[in-house]
Amino acid sequence: MRIQFDVAAQETGWSVRRQGKVLGTFASRMTALGAAENFARASARHGDSAVVRVVAGGEIQEERSFASDIF
């Protein structure tokens, strides 16, 4: 299964979302990106693949993929 986390600018900072649900809001883009990557790595450890997308203005600005190292 592929799990997707989105990092997007909000009025109050940067949010991390999964399936439309806000998992957290952070003051900086880098902090939000770090949190999203941690969520993705944890998901990948359990056999799923995960992707972190930075979304701005409705467009994907950056995308990073994480896969399980369990074979």
Residue ranges and their predicted role:
Residues 1-3, 31, 43, 70-71:
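Short, solvent-exposed secondary-structure boundary motifs
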Residues 1-22:
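Short aromatic-glycine-(Arg/Gly/Cys) micro-motifs in beta-strand/loop hairpins
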Residues 6, 28-31, 65:
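Short capping/connector residues at structural and topological boundaries
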Residues 17, 26, 62-64:
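Short acidic, gly/pro-rich beta-turn/loop elements at beta-sheet edges
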Residues 19-31:
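A short, exposed loop/beta-hairpin motif centered on an aromatic-Gly-Thr core
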Residues 45-70:
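Short, mixed-charge low-complexity intrinsically disordered segments
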